[in-house]
């Protein structure tokens, strides 16, 4: 919402749930630090870049500590540094027990996942499980699968 500061936008789900202001601030501090948005929390959406808006949206999703996070193209508006930071944050969150379902067209983003599902014509076409694969090996498997899918058209 353009009439709310980034901080107020992030707080919105907590306000609607009846949290006290001090509780909201305590939740926000570590998330804002991890997403590198502490210095812009008092700015309005029209005053920040697309990537900064994206990181504020991620903070709003994380502040409620959900068991399931739905992320639709979360790295789409981010530069490579911010993308890497967000993917590491998602990995840490996932390691703490939260499930993340991410829709992405980015092979780089997908190569960080534990499981990648390829959907074609509304059905699961192929799956890759990470297992012990490195990020580079996972990237290669995803790229090979995308090549296979493209050659079948």
Q: What spans do the regions from the language model cover?
A:
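Short coil-to-helix segment of the ABC ATPase nucleotide-binding domain corresponding to the Q-loop/switch region
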Residues: 4-12
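Conserved ABC ATPase signature
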Residues: 44-48, 52
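Catalytic Walker B motif of ABC-type/P-loop ATPase nucleotide-binding domains
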Residues: 69-72
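Hydrophobic anchor residue at the start of the ABC signature
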Residues: 58
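Conserved beta-strand-loop-alpha-helix hinge in the C-terminal portion
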Residues: 123-147
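A short, proline-enriched helix->beta-strand linker immediately N-terminal to the Walker B motif
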Residues: 63-67
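ABC nucleotide-binding domain "signature" region
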Residues: 23-35, 145
């Amino acid at each position: 919402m353009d009439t709310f500061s980034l901080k107020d936008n992030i707080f919105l789900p907590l306000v609607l749930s009846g949290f006290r202001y001090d509780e909201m601030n305590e939740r926000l501090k570590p998330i804002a630090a991890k997403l590198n948005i502490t210095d812009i929390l008092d700015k309005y959406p029209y005053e920040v870049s697309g990537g900064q808006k994206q990181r504020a949206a991620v903070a709003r999703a994380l502040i409620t500590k959900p068991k399931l996070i739905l992320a639709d193209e979360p790295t789409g508006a981010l530069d490579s540094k911010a993308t890497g930071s967000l993917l590491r944050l998602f990995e840490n969150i996932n390691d703490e027990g939260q499930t993340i379902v991410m829709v992405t067209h980015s092979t780089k983003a997908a190569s960080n996942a534990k499981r990648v599902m390829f959907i074609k014509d509304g059905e699961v076409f192929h799956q890759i499980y990470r297992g012990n694969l490195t990020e580079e090996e996972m990237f290669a498997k995803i790229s090979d699968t995308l090549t296979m899918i493209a050659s079948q058209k």
